[in-house]
Amino acid sequence: MSNESKCPFSGHNSKPQVTVGGGTANLHWWPNQLRVDLLNQHSERSNPLGKDFNYRQEFKKLDYYALKADIKNVLTDSQDWWPADWGNYTGLFIRLAWHAAGTYRMGDGRGGAGRGQQRFAPLNSWPDNASLDKARRLLWPVKQKYGQKISWADLFILAGNIALESSGFRTFGFGAGREDVWEPDNDVNWGDEKEWLAHRNSEALAGSNLAATEMGLIYVNPEGPQASGDPRSAAPFIRATFGNMAMDDEEIVALIAGGHTLGKTHGAAPADHVQADPEGAPIEQMGFGWANSYGTGVGKDAITSGLEVIWSQTPTQWSNYFFENLFKYEWVQERSPAGAIQWVAADAEAIIPDPFDPSIKRKPTMLTTDLTLRFDPEFEKISRRFLNDPQAFANAFARAWFKLTHRDMGPKARYLGPEVPAEDLIWQDPLPAASATPSSASIADAKAKIVALGLSAGELVSLAWASASTFRGGDKRGGANGAHIALSPQREWEVNKKAVETLTQIEELKASTQLSLADLIVLAGNVGVEQAAQAAGFNITVPFAPGRVDALQSQTDVESFQLLLGLADGFRNWKKQGVNTPAEVLLIDKAQQLTLTAPELTALIGGLRVLGTNWDGSQHGVFTQQVGVLSTDFFTNLLDMSNVWAPVDSTSEVFEGKDRKSGTVKFTATRNDLVFGSNSILRALAEVYAQADGKEKFVQDFVAAWTKVMNLDRFDLA
């Protein structure tokens, strides 16, 4: 058999193998290519459960306390393939839950535990998640037993809670409701570094959406910045990373100390004994990674972080030993068996139990970042208070742990299960209880009063969009429910200036209707859409679901809500001054946060432009002579080859469209507008609506996408 005739998949042919999805990708040739593909993540094509599956309904069939009992049994059912420290997986499951939730960042609301992402790359193979593949596999028999009645995302967090409870700790509660997805969240920017554990400075962290000091870590390097072994210099990095998760100093101290009250780290030998992570491991390892050639590779020979630290005399039982040991002893720097920097209590007796040999005792050990809680002045004050008041520490940790593990779930209305705390917490963006649903007659009366105001379709639509478009699909915050546009800080946002002028008139109607202001705002937008569609020759009724309520200023964390402003809203042609990111990139970001598909994005932009909804009243992208008519003019004029476009200055932010022959300026546009003609994917979508038979479809698609945005935060309708 000649070389030329050998099978190309046999491994014996020197010719390049042709594989599906292989070869040089578009992003190689055009690394700045617009990521329109991010709008098509998590489609029905990747979901094996189908579009009719309802997790909330399935969860209600669950025997919740039987599930808890089964998870508790797993804790002490040590497996030979991954033996439990002290015969108990408590520390491992706490770390599993912590690291599932700890990727959340409040800046853009992405990351976190809400979608079970730790099952997928890159998180399943982050250096900081080493050995959590074993924790997930330990839970598989439980997941297999209960099936779709419990998601992996909920199971990870619940396992952490049960681990704490089994140690004698009283948790604050648990809310289920995290729905699994079936592929990685490719929209999350984990950083630009191309090497694991590449370091970032604290100033850059504080001004970014990144939640870790190094690529592949959950928070900070436990050896200190760049493994310096300096507890004091670690403080600003700790504050920056935990601060990006909305944690204050007390919560930081409570979380670090509470998380390190139980369990241990693993560093039996140098890292050169450790093989590939799960994504890079050989197929026969069946999704496991970090195979360890040192000794048995498990148990006393385990290598995870490379650190070998046990903080407490009772590492499977809740105690105050972390703080007692932290302040009782003088700490001397040492190296773990793996060569990592850690600290040992030089003046202590050997009082720490060995995890596998009860005849062996060790001296207390700490991480560099643990000592930060003693040597940073502000952290030290809190730590001493917790030292002297163990109950205050336990209460603070219980609340901080609940916040850590639920911060990305959105409003409490999404929580499921019998252990949801009754208390409303400010970070949950609480809302008043809903009153009686308004009748059809009262809705019709309110619509008539809105029409009587004589406001334009664009004014009505602009207000509703400003109210609803703050929604973030990552952490389920924002949206029209609550009418937060009437409160600080949203009422003062520059981008809402014209919308608030309309809001003032809608507010005056509230007393004479049976609707909440939040409902009135959305209804006003619907009226505007209906008027614009009628002007285009289509009589439609935009779906309206009443039941929204009005938040109080006292229920609104101004600093937290300020983050919902974001960097841009390309739907209104607004971009924050000083932001250098191209507008079209931020438009995709905004659309992805609104959970829009590429076709929905296209329909909404085309409709909003012809209605004249730019934040400042400018004519950029308003490619029509019939402003207020829900026409396809945006698309037909954008794709009209009689127009030629050029930037008005060197920034290439604003463009003029001139008649190709006469040179007369016909339109102006931003990058948000022209991208629907320049990007090949978005142009293909724009062409659908620019075609002769696209008018009715456009109106239908716009109304559907509009209604979706108006209801994004209506979790009560699910």
Curated annotation (Swiss-Prot):
GO MF annotations, alphabetized: catalase activity; heme binding; metal ion binding
PROSITE patterns for the chain: PEROXIDASE_2 (PS00436), PEROXIDASE_4 (PS50873)
Cellular component terms per the entry's GO annotation: cytosol
Catalysed reaction, written as an equation: H2O2 + AH2 = A + 2 H2O; 2 H2O2 = O2 + 2 H2O
One protein family per Pfam: peroxidase
SUPFAM superfamilies registered for this protein in UniProt: Heme-dependent peroxidases
UniProt-annotated site: Transition state stabilizer, residues: R95
Cofactor comment: Binds 1 heme b (iron(II)-protoporphyrin IX) group per dimer.
Signal sequence bounds: none
Tryptophyl-tyrosyl-methioninium (Trp-Tyr) (with M-245) cross-link, renumbered residues: W98-Y219
Record PTM: Formation of the three residue Trp-Tyr-Met cross-link is important for the catalase, but not the peroxidase activity of the enzyme.
Cross-link (Tryptophyl-tyrosyl-methioninium (Tyr-Met) (with W-98)): Y219-M245
Annotated TM spans: none
Enzyme Commission number: 1.11.1.21
Active-site annotation: H99 (proton acceptor)
Cofactor or coenzyme needed: heme b
Gene Ontology terms describing biological process: cellular response to hydrogen peroxide; hydrogen peroxide catabolic process
Keywords in alphabetical order: Heme, Hydrogen peroxide, Iron, Metal-binding, Oxidoreductase, Peroxidase
Disulfide bond positions: none
Amino acids binding heme b: H260
PANTHER family from the UniProt entry: CATALASE-PEROXIDASE, HYDROPEROXIDASE I, BIFUNCTIONAL CATALASE-PEROXIDASE
Subunit structure: Homodimer or homotetramer.
Function: Bifunctional enzyme with both catalase and broad-spectrum peroxidase activity.
Similarity-based family: Belongs to the peroxidase family. Peroxidase/catalase subfamily.
Protein name: Catalase-peroxidase
